[in-house]
């Protein structure tokens, strides 16, 4: 700072002075003790503290102290403002300038690179209290940081510059535990590299097992969705038609079954003898006014047949095979009136026929009849009316009923009133026998027969329909039976059939007829096809014998 005189006026010239020149004016260059205890001595003390690397003090804090003390020194005993001219203090003017330190960062980095023995700690964790501090010596370990200060040195040097400066000295830095780097990625790589070998050595086999479990679970999930996918499933073409052996007839199949040796023959024979020992007991209970019903696993036809041949040879008896598809309650009544009572006449209704039977047994107390029924729970006799008729027959004192059931829900056919009419005694007669006769009328893929139970199904379906619907089906069946000898018969056209139904007053429009035909088609009772001329033809897919039995049954019921 200097001043010049010009025209009798003093002018002050302010010039920026670096720190080195200021120190030369305050202290001697040879490091001699300061001459006076002034503010400049405080600057020297602060400078010495900054150059001490053992304290690890942040760079910004001492620099701010030096700036403040330096300004105080320049502004001593100056109280005038800048407008007063000669009395302007240096502190007021100096505060408007930004202090520039040329090459200060490079010098600091050079000093750090030249002192590799000194360790510098870095802040790695978020919590300052858990920062890493390498054990350089006991003196640094025992030091307790004062409040408001940090022992950690957070470097502000650019990462690239520090990397260039520290690269040549890495091979020789054997005493240093940590490198002067503040990169979080490098520290994470070092920590992971140090931890990985111990983990691998402790549990070498865990990782493959976990991967195997994940792969297995993923495979199971994929297989589940593949199995339940909505893709089209192809049906196998391996059918019975591809077999070289043709379908067998009923007699051939029965002969083959008879030639097959039965398993557990001795055990089955002992069971049969056990049941045969009850024959006289059953005979006594029948005469006491009870009726016998047999249940259990296996066919009981042979057991009832043995009872008939051993005890009923000299008695009047009727055997009814209810597994036959065309059996009805009316056919049972006809067998009693015609074969047992010898009455060839016809009756107007089943009620009149039932009254005749009751009156005949009432008039002749010496008349006794044994009624043996196989499969009382068959499909043809499960209806309400059939069970009511059989219950009234079982209630006759001189008519004795012995029946068998095979369905597990057979007792549900009878309510309390029917139970009182039957007056059952239940016997468990498990025979483990084959249902050969009972299933002989079932549809089989191995026998050359078609629709043995067609009549039974047809009867059940038509019973649930209206009288007009039954009349419509009857017209179609009669027309088909009338053309049974015509080899070129393809069916009855819809228009001709509609005209016949309209003349019989069964329908009043073609929509009503089509609605009824749709119901027949759903039950597979009829089949429709179009001819070459586009006309729709109707046909019943049943054999002539079944249609004949159906028409005879309808004639008897009416």
From Swiss-Prot:
It holds the Pfam family RecA-like_ORC2. GO terms for molecular function: chromatin binding; DNA replication origin binding. GO terms for cellular component: nuclear origin of replication recognition complex. It is found in: Nucleus. InterPro entries: ORC2 (IPR007220), RecA-like_ORC2 (IPR056772), WHD_ORC2 (IPR056773). ORC is composed of six subunits. This is Origin recognition complex subunit 2. It comes from Xenopus laevis (African clawed frog). The lineage of its organism: Eukaryota, Metazoa, Chordata, Craniata, Vertebrata.
């Amino acid at each position: 700072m200097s001043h010049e005189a010009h025209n009798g006026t003093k002018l002050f010239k302010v010039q920026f002075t670096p720190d080195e020149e200021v120190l030369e004016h305050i202290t001697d260059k040879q490091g001699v003790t300061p001459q006076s205890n002034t503010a400049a001595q405080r600057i020297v003390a602060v400078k010495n503290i900054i150059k001490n690397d053992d304290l690890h003090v942040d760079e910004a804090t001492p620099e701010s102290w030096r700036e403040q003390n330096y300004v105080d020194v320049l502004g001593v005993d100056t109280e005038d403002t800048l407008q007063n001219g000669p009395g302007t203090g240096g502190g007021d003017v100096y505060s408007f300038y930004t202090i520039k330190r040329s090459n200060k960062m490079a010098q600091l980095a050079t000093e750090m690179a030249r002192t590799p023995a000194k360790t510098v700690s870095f802040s790695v964790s978020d919590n300052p209290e858990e920062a890493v501090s390498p054990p350089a010596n006991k003196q640094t370990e025992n030091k307790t940081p004062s409040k408001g200060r940090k022992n950690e040195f957070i470097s502000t040097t650019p990462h690239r510059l520090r990397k260039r400066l520290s690269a040549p000295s890495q091979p020789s830095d054997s005493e240093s535990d940590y490198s002067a780097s503040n990169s979080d990625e490098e520290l994470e790589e070092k920590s992971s590299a140090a931890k990985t070998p111990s983990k691998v050595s402790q549990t070498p086999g865990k990782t493959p097992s976990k991967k195997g479990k994940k792969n297995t679970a993923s495979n199971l999930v994929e297989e589940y969705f593949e199995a339940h996918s909505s893709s089209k499933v192809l049906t196998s073409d391996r059918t019975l038609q591809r077999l070289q052996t043709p379908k067998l007839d009923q007699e051939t199949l029965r002969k083959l079954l008879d030639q097959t040796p039965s398993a557990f023959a001795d055990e089955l024979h002992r069971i049969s003898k056990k049941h045969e020992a009850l024959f006289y007991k059953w005979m006594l209970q029948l005469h006491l006014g009870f009726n016998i019903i047999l249940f259990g696993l296996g066919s009981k036809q042979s057991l009832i047949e043995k009872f008939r041949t051993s005890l009923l040879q000299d008695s009047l008896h009727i055997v009814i095979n209810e597994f036959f598809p065309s059996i009805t309650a009316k056919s049972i009544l006809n067998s009693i009136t015609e074969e047992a009572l010898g009455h060839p006449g016809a009756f107007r209704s089943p009620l009149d026929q039932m009254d005749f039977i009751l009156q005949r047994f009432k008039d002749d107390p010496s008349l006794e009849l044994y009624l043996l029924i196989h499969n009382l729970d068959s499909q043809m006799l499960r209806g309400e009316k059939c069970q009511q008729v059989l219950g009234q027959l079982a209630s006759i004192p001189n008519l004795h009923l012995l029946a068998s059931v095979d369905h597990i829900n057979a007792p549900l056919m009878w309510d309390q009133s029917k139970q009182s009419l039957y007056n059952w005694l239940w016997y468990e007669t498990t025979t483990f026998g084959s249902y050969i006769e009972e299933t002989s009328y079932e549809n089989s893929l191995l026998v050359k027969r078609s629709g043995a139970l067609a009549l039974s199904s047809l009867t059940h379906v038509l019973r649930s329909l209206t009288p007009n619907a039954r009349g419509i089906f009857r017209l179609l069946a009669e027309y088909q039976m009338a053309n049974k000898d015509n080899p070129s018969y393809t069916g009855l056209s819809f228009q001709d059939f509609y005209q016949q139904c309209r003349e019989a007053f069964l329908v009043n429009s073609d929509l009503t007829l089509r609605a009824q035909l749709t119901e027949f088609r759903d039950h597979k009772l009829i089949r429709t096809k179009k001819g070459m001329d586009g006309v729709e033809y109707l046909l019943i897919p049943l054999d002539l014998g079944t249609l004949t039995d159906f028409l005879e049954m309808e004639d008897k019921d009416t």
